[in-house]
Amino acid sequence: DASFSSWG
């Protein structure tokens, strides 16, 4: 999820 958070 943290990775996707970077994408927005």
From Swiss-Prot:
It is found in: Secreted. Keywords: Amidation, Neuropeptide, Secreted. The modification Glycine amide is found at residue 8. GO terms for cellular component: extracellular region. GO terms for biological process: neuropeptide signaling pathway. Belongs to the kinin family. Mediates visceral muscle contractile activity (myotropic activity). This is Kinin-2. It comes from Periplaneta americana.
